[in-house]
């Protein structure tokens, strides 16, 4: 089953919005994840990155930032950069598994 973790061993239950961009030649792309009031804000532990885990293994990004409202963390944003077509395809396989596990669908904008 596919999951996302910020603290290793603790699955994040909040479903993020995900914004994808891809270069015209299809070689590179980015995914921006936005979690509003994620569970990790109530957890104890060090956030060392965002871990996308499925049966193929683990995709990791260290580009994780918190957004604060009135001095309290409310939103976590993570950026994953795909530097080649293979990374894009691997990411899309993960996202398909994650969507299936969470009962979601892909929607083009």
UniProtKB/Swiss-Prot annotation:
Coiled coil: none annotated. Keywords: Chloroplast, Membrane, Photosynthesis, Photosystem II, Plastid, Thylakoid. One of its GO terms (cellular component) is photosystem II. InterPro entries: Psb28_c1_sf (IPR038676), PSII_Psb28_class-1 (IPR005610). It is a peripheral membrane protein. This is Photosystem II reaction center Psb28 protein. HAMAP family: PSII_Psb28. GO terms for biological process: photosynthesis. Belongs to the Psb28 family. The gene is psb28. Part of the photosystem II complex.
């Amino acid at each position: 089953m596919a999951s996302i973790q910020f603290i290793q061993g603790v699955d994040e239950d909040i479903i993020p919005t995900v914004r994808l961009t891809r270069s015209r030649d299809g070689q590179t792309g980015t995914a921006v994840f936005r979690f509003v009031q994620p569970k990790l804000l109530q957890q104890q532990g060090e956030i060392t990155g965002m871990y996308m885990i499925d049966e193929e293994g683990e995709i990791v990004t260290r580009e994780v930032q918190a957004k604060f409202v009135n001095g309290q963390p409310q939103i976590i944003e993570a950026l994953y950069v795909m530097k080649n077509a293979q990374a894009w395809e691997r990411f899309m396989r993960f996202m398909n598994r994650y969507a299936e596990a969470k009962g979601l669908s892909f929607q083009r904008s």
